[in-house]
A protein has these predicted regions:
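Short, small-residue-biased leader/transition segments that mark boundaries at the very start
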Residues: 1-7
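Phosphate-handling active-site elements
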Residues: 2, 26-27, 143
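Active-site Tyr-X1-5-Lys
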Residues: 8-36, 52-68, 72
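A short small-residue
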Residues: 34-38, 111-112
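Conserved sequence/active-site signature of Rossmann-fold short-chain dehydrogenase/reductase
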Residues: 38-40, 127
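Active-site loop immediately N-terminal to the catalytic Tyr-X3-Lys motif
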Residues: 45-46
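C-terminal substrate-binding subdomain of Rossmann-fold SDR/epimerase-dehydratase oxidoreductases
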Residues: 62-186
Length: 186
């Protein structure tokens, strides 16, 4: 996953720089926006490749289902989103094995890291609203100080300005899902 993140980060930076360069070289009015961590409708909840918030929600949900022996809910979840080919028709042993691989058991759920990093999250529809607002009200020349020799970093960061620790986010998910097990950070 490290190399995927590196490629994705480089692609984002290249896109930002492309907009900036076109504006300077050709007089276009492209505005590049950089969102914070997004979540919302049609999010990716696959354990193999989801982002932090949907991964935590799903892991804690599945741990709760295991803790309560709610095999109907577990099978429904895995039928919608199989994990490593294990779907809702698999045996309990196969299901337990694959979930355990991802740190999901009934009594506990393991989340990556220390829980201390701060992250900012934004509802995807609010990101869309902010993008439309920027298209209608902001010009490239508004993104840098006039008379500056080097025009750089002309993108606009979009977020809430409110950060939360991963541990506090996990606590919020635990509270909302009413999970009675333990969250462990590795």
């Amino acid at each position: 996953m490290g190399s995927e993140m590196c490629i994705r980060d480089r692609a984002k930076i290249a896109g930002l720089k492309m907009c900036e360069s076109f504006n300077l070289q050709y007089g276009t009015n492209y505005i590049a926006v950089m969102p914070t961590n997004l979540y919302g409708p049609n999010d990716n909840f696959h354990l193999e490749n989801s982002h932090v918030l949907p991964a935590m929600i799903r892991k804690i949900h599945l741990a709760k289902c295991l803790n309560e022996s709610d095999w109907g809910a577990i099978r429904k979840d895995l039928s919608l989103r199989p994990v490593e080919g294990v779907d809702g028709t698999a045996s309990e042993g196969e299901i337990l094995s694959v979930l355990h691989k991802y740190g999901i058991t009934g009594p506990s759920v393991v989340l990556w890291g220390t829980g201390k990093p701060l992250r900012e999250f934004l509802w995807s529809e609010e990101m869309a609203d902010a993008s439309v607002y920027i298209m209608e009200h902001v010009n490239f020349e508004d993104t840098y100080q006039k008379g500056t020799k080097d025009v750089r970093n002309c993108h606009i960061n979009i977020g809430t300005g409110k950060e939360i620790t991963i541990a506090a986010l996990a606590d919020l998910i635990v509270k909302e899902t009413k999970y009675q097990g333990k969250v462990i950070f590795d």
